[in-house]
UniProtKB/Swiss-Prot annotation:
Enzyme class, UniProt record, top EC level: transferase
Keywords, ordered alphabetically: Glycogen biosynthesis, Glycosyltransferase, Transferase
Gene name in the database record: glgA
Residues that bind ADP-alpha-D-glucose: K15
Name this polypeptide is given: Glycogen synthase
Xref: PANTHER family: ALPHA AMYLASE DOMAIN-CONTAINING PROTEIN, GRANULE-BOUND STARCH SYNTHASE 1, CHLOROPLASTIC/AMYLOPLASTIC
GO molecular function, one term: alpha-1,4-glucan glucosyltransferase (UDP-glucose donor) activity
Keyword Transmembrane: no
Length: 483
């Protein structure tokens, strides 16, 4: 089966968040199943600079943007073994340093950039005489593609659309509707119209042959008014075409047995290295040495409301006053940064805030902490809790989205639990869950057994398993396209 993955991100060359990692993990896993996989991404300026040997495949392919035309070039690059990637290049739209924005904020023409990217896919496939069996489009940046295919483009190809986060709707101002190249039927409420705007995400949801989101629980949550971002009615309408598939983990990157970023490797057969990692982390972060005999929580996150940062700010005083240490690595909204700095000043040696995106430090926190906090308001899939399980670092998570599918509370799943969960989105509920984890930590034998269960449970979160589920969806999409 020929599969074309279309994405705005692909690790390691164009990464802003989990989307890039997901595409880099899924592509080789599908290849291993026997699929002929290609990945198309925009030719961002900084990516082209990092890939000077990118092979020119075709150039000056005309892409209609309504009242005017633009051109696209196609270049081939291999960012990682088993990943055949193609960059859609246009200097005026993508020749910049940044995926969605730069230091001054998001690019104001992002909707135009990704309309062009989406419309270039059928044009470039036609120019290169390439006919995939399936296009796998991802999030609002590629949501126009299923609508174009429904209108008649690429009639021999099926479309599968992946919702990584329903909260990002990809608005197009009505005055730019001509760029889309769609008839008025597609611009109606039954199509991509959304409260006076046009939504590229809604276009993908409305017109793809099959839909996927990134966890079973999230697939149900987005059918509710609370978490459907105004699209819950459409999600319920298309529920029979929707599947929830957990993302996998790249165990070549995230493994305590081989991790080059941590001071001492370890495994379930020999856990001595985890204690050494904890001591090294406490020393590096300037934490109280007495915390070697107390639970230390870590958190690796972006500082946005989705991630439950207000719960952390509200609960940290109680957590550290109960004898725990807390290390938080992340960057984002300035209001959260100020509050976290204030807490670090109030609890020196007990609470450490590191304002940065620092992947090597993220690995060291994952290995050195006793538990990992994920108190998200919502979490479509989540990866850090899966990393934590792999490292024997017990997750304390709010039971939402992918967190509910991967973290099993030791009380609710007697004998099979791998962490601690809570339901209410409040500092008190988070603090109570942390208190339960802290009390369990004091029973060293029970904590050791829990770590072993956690590490064993991580083994199912593979891209190979996810790829098999995607392949099944592709087969169903191809059958649906032929009807």
């Amino acid at each position: 089966m020929k599969v074309l993955i279309v994405s705005s991100e692909l690790s390691p060359i164009a990464k802003e968040g989990g989307l890039g990692d997901a595409m880099a993990g899924l592509a080789p896993a599908l290849d291993a199943l026997g699929c002929e996989v290609k990945v198309a991404i925009p030719g961002y300026g900084h990516v082209l600079e990092s890939c000077p040997g990118a092979e020119l495949i075709t150039e000056n392919v005309r892409v209609s943007m309504g009242y005017f035309n633009m051109t696209a070039d196609l270049r081939k690059v291999e960012p990682a073994p088993g990943v055949e990637a193609y960059m859609v290049c246009n200097e005026s739209l993508f020749g910049r340093h940044g995926v969605y924005g730069d230091n001054d904020g998001l690019f104001m023409d992002n909707h135009k950039r990704y309309i062009f990217f989406s419309k270039s896919i059928p044009a470039l496939c036609s120019a290169s005489r390439y006919i995939p069996d399936v296009i796998l489009a991802n999030d609002w940046q590629t949501g126009l593609i299923p609508a174009l295919m429904d209108q008649g483009h690429m009639p021999q190809t099926a479309s599968v659309f992946v919702i990584h986060n329903i909260g990002y709707l990809g608005y197009v101002p009505p005055e730019d509707a001509s760029m889309l190249g769609l008839s008025n039927t597609y611009l109606s409420y039954e199509g991509m119209e959304f409260y006076g705007q046009l939504s590229l995400l809604k276009a993908g949801i409305a017109y793809a042959n099959k839909l996927v989101t990134v966890s079973p629980t999230y697939s149900r949550e987005i059918q509710t008014t609370e978490q459907g971002a105004g699209l819950d009615g459409l999600m319920r309408k298309r529920s029979q075409d929707l599947a929830g598939i957990l993302n996998g983990v790249d165990f070549q990157v995230w493994s305590p047995e081989t991790d080059k970023h941590i001071p001492c490797n370890y495994s379930t057969a020999d856990m001595a290295g985890k204690g050494k990692c904890k001591k090294a982390l406490l020393d590096e972060m300037g934490m109280d040495s007495q915390l070697m005999n107390a639970p230390v929580a870590g958190m690796v996150t972006r500082l946005f409301s989705q991630k439950g940062i207000e719960l952390v700010i509200g609960a940290v005083p109680e957590i550290v006053e109960n004898g725990m240490g807390f290390i938080l690595l992340g960057n984002g909204e300035e209001s959260y940064v100020r509050d976290l700095r204030r807490l670090a000043q109030a609890y020196p040696g007990r609470f450490r805030f590191e304002e940065a995106f620092n992947e090597p430090l993220a690995h060291r926190i994952m290995a050195g902490a006793d538990m990992l906090c994920v108190p998200s308001l919502y979490e479509p899939c989540g990866l850090t809790q899966m990393y934590a399980l792999q490292y024997g670092t017990i997750p304390v998570a709010r039971a939402t989205g992918g967190l509910a599918d991967t973290v099993r509370d030791i009380k609710a799943f007697a004998g099979k639990g791998n962490g601690f969960t809570f339901d209410a989105f409040s500092p008190g509920a988070f603090a109570n869950a942390m208190d339960r984890a802290g009390r369990h930590y004091k029973n060293r034998k029970a904590w050791s057994a829990l770590r072993t269960k956690a590490m064993a449970s991580a083994g199912v979160f593979t891209w190979d398993m996810a790829a098999e589920q995607y392949y099944s969806i592709f087969e169903r999409a191809v059958r649906a396209r032929r009807l």
